[in-house]
Amino acid sequence: MAKFVIRPATAADCSDILRLIKELAKYEYMEEQVILTEKDLLEDGFGEHPFYHCLVAEVPKEHLTPEGHSIVGFAMYYFTYDPWIGKLLYLEDFFVMSDYRGFGIGSEILKNLSQVAMKCRCSSMHFLVAEWNEPSINFYKRRGASDLSSEEGWRLFKIDKEYLLKMAAEE
């Protein structure tokens, strides 16, 4: 299968993006944590001030999934800023359906993301990978990624909404 297109997502792609987000969450054993809706994706990514950007991988009709889908991969990203090095492209989610891996789709998505990062004068691209996900770790390392957890000793933290509300209400 040599034919596929990587393109910016449109509002019409939201149902496919959500489907792929759920597939990725299932792959990561976190399926029950997806609470996002198609409406959220539409409002958050395609309004006046989008919170995210997205690329999709689309195959022609002769290569549709068994369920009839043409969107077989996606990358969701946004821009952020590091006060030490400047602009960053943060890759939030990146997934290609298992039946479509090995055809260069993931490599082409990453190439497109790299072009976006360079066009926007970003100094690097950051992302998370589950420790157990050796195929993805190897995919990124083959392309020059470095593991900041082991090399620089950083830890990722989060503050859930209930604690944000509590802190926001403090006097």
Curated annotation (Swiss-Prot):
Species whose genome carries this gene: Sus scrofa (Pig)
A GO BP entry: spermidine acetylation
Assigned EC number: 2.3.1.57
Active site, per annotation: Y140 (proton donor)
Family, similarity comment: Belongs to the acetyltransferase family.
Keyword match Protein transport: no
Annotated catalysed reactions: an alkane-alpha,omega-diamine + acetyl-CoA = an N-acetylalkane-alpha,omega-diamine + CoA + H(+); spermidine + acetyl-CoA = N(1)-acetylspermidine + CoA + H(+); spermine + acetyl-CoA = N(1)-acetylspermine + CoA + H(+)
Positions bound to substrate: Y27, E28, E92, H126, F127, L128, E152
Assigned keywords, A-Z: Acyltransferase, Cytoplasm, Transferase
Pathway as given in its UniProt record: Amine and polyamine degradation; putrescine degradation; N-acetylputrescine from putrescine: step 1/1
Chain ranges of the N-acetyltransferase domain: 4-170
Alphabetical list of Gene3D superfamilies matching this protein: 3.40.630.30
Statement: the UniProt record of this protein carries the keyword Transferase: yes
Record's function text: Enzyme which catalyzes the acetylation of polyamines. Substrate specificity: norspermidine = spermidine >> spermine > N(1)-acetylspermine. This highly regulated enzyme allows a fine attenuation of the intracellular concentration of polyamines. Also involved in the regulation of polyamine transport out of cells. Also acts on 1,3-diaminopropane and 1,5-diaminopentane.
Residues that coordinate or bind acetyl-CoA: 94-96, 102-107, 133-136, 140-143
A Gene Ontology molecular function term of the record: identical protein binding
InterPro entries reported for this sequence: Acyl_CoA_acyltransferase, Diverse_Substrate_AcTransf, GNAT_dom
Name of this protein: Diamine acetyltransferase 1
A Pfam family matched in the record: Acetyltransf_1
Alphabetical list of PROSITE patterns matching this protein: GNAT
